[in-house]
């Protein structure tokens, strides 16, 4: 199964961008969850505005779907500046980045998603731009080539990544602010679902919002996606009213259980229990057993399972916890 095909995937789907923009909070006051990040960014932004400076360069990292792009846009809105958006894989040539940098206005935000995928050549262009607001450009070719420096306006680079450990040290060290986004609580997700329902003019019971939230794997993007599918079900089966029973029926139809697991999650945990006696099992063996790439397990499946206490990562391998056995209604054998 391709990760992007899963309804509980934290990765963005192509057709979601327009709807996501419609329900995305614009200001910190509307931003739900991440209290420490919200408080810190409020201080940093206000201080930069008081000094009439550009905000320090900001690195945002965390699992997919937690709001990195949303936070980048909020920074630009709070600073009252423009935001230009690109991604690491798109920036193939130094000239591509140079064109974006030279078109920035003072204090503008340049947002680079998947910044860990920048090529070394692009990073070399970024270093002086981030540190000195200067751009080194080579003019000509061969022996006649020469380097000229262009001054850039003070700007804020906001980088987003799901793999902060993959950033090179020179790039990571140039970010003055580093924020990690954590999985959201069910309470915060319930508020997010209720807010999104309001933006979409949906008739949603509070308990129905809770049902969607608790199956959303701590991830706002998943919560909003499930809400849209529950809306479809309610439109067809209940005149558009999303009651708690309708929400439960819709989510059951979508094969999302009470813990927010889909077939792939259950397949992974079942493999650890049934094929490897609960573990420990090495990542390569586990990947082979369920027919998935090890990167998919490590980057997509494991973070939530570990964070929720269903899977334990040890030096010897992955181990199913007692919570996993209880979820499947099984008795854990004594060691």
Swiss-Prot record:
Positions binding DNA in this chain are: 294, 313, 318
Region described as Small ATPAse domain (RuvB-S): spans on this chain: 185-255
Q: What is its EC number?
A: 3.6.4.-
Q: Which CDD domains match?
A: AAA
Ubl conjugation in keyword set: no
Coiled coil located at which positions?
none
Q: Where does ATP bind?
A: 23-24, 65, 68-70, 131-133, 174, 184, 221
**Assembly:** Homohexamer. Forms an RuvA(8)-RuvB(12)-Holliday junction (HJ) complex. HJ DNA is sandwiched between 2 RuvA tetramers; dsDNA enters through RuvA and exits via RuvB. An RuvB hexamer assembles on each DNA strand where it exits the tetramer. Each RuvB hexamer is contacted by two RuvA subunits (via domain III) on 2 adjacent RuvB subunits; this complex drives branch migration. In the full resolvosome a probable DNA-RuvA(4)-RuvB(12)-RuvC(2) complex forms which resolves the HJ.
HAMAP family linked: DNA_HJ_migration_RuvB
**UniProt free text on domains:** Has 3 domains, the large (RuvB-L) and small ATPase (RuvB-S) domains and the C-terminal head (RuvB-H) domain. The head domain binds DNA, while the ATPase domains jointly bind ATP, ADP or are empty depending on the state of the subunit in the translocation cycle. During a single DNA translocation step the structure of each domain remains the same, but their relative positions change.
Indicate what this protein is called per its UniProt record: Holliday junction branch migration complex subunit RuvB
Q: Which organism is it from?
A: Haemophilus influenzae (strain PittEE)
- Please name the gene that encodes this protein: ruvB
């Amino acid at each position: 199964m391709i990760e992007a095909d899963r309804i509980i995937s934290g990765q963005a789907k192509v057709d979601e961008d327009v709807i996501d923009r419609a329900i995305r909070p614009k200001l910190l006051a509307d931003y739900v969850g991440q209290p420490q990040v919200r408080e810190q960014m409020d201080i940093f932004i206000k201080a930069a505005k008081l000094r009439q400076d550009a905000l320090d360069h900001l690195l945002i990292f965390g699992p997919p779907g937690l709001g990195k792009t949303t936070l980048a846009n909020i920074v630009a809105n709070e600073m009252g500046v423009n935001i230009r958006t690109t991604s690491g894989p798109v920036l193939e040539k130094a000239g591509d980045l140079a064109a974006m940098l030279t078109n920035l206005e003072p204090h503008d935000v340049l947002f680079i998603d998947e910044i860990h995928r920048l090529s070394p050549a692009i990073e070399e262009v970024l270093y002086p731009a981030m540190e000195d607001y200067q751009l080194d450009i080579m003019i000509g070719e061969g022996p006649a080539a020469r380097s000229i420096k262009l001054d850039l306006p003070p700007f804020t680079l906001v980088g987003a990544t799901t793999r902060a450990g993959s950033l090179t040290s020179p790039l990571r060290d140039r970010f003055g602010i580093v924020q990690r986004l954590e999985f959201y609580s069910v309470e915060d997700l319930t508020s997010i679902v209720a807010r999104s329902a309001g933006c979409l003019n949906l008739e949603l019971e509070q308990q129905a919002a809770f049902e969607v939230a608790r199956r959303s794997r701590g991830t706002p993007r998943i919560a909003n996606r499930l809400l849209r599918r529950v809306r479809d079900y309610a439109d067809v089966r209940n005149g558009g009213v999303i009651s708690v029973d309708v929400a439960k029926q819709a989510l059951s139809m979508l094969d999302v259980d009470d813990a927010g697991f889909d077939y792939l999650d259950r397949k992974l945990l079942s493999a650890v229990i049934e094929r490897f006696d609960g573990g420990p099992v090495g990542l390569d063996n586990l990947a082979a057993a369920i027919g998935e790439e090890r990167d998919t397990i490590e980057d997509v499946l494991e973070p939530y399972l570990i964070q929720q206490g269903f899977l334990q990562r040890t030096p010897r391998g992955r181990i199913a916890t007692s919570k996993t056995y209880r979820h499947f209604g099984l008795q854990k054998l004594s060691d």
